[in-house]
Amino acid sequence: MKVLDEFDITDRTKLRLQVGEYRDQERIDIRQYIKVDNEFIPTKKGVNFSSEWLDKFFLMVEKLKDI
C-alpha cells in the first residue's frame, strides 16, 4: 500500500489514507493506526473499498457539509 496522506489524532493514534492493489483491483484504505513499541500498526477501525466506488464515496462525504 502507498501512503497518500495521514494526520495525527493523538500522539499515539493517526488516520492514514492509502492506495494499493489486491487481487488485481485498485483499493482505497482509510484506517486508524495506533503506536505500539514506537511503530504504528493498523487497527480494525477503518474502511477498504474498490477505487471504482470513489465517486460514490465522494457523494456520501459531500452530504456531511449539510450537518
Identify the residue ranges that each predicted region occupies.
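Positively charged, low-complexity terminal tracts
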Residues: M1-I67
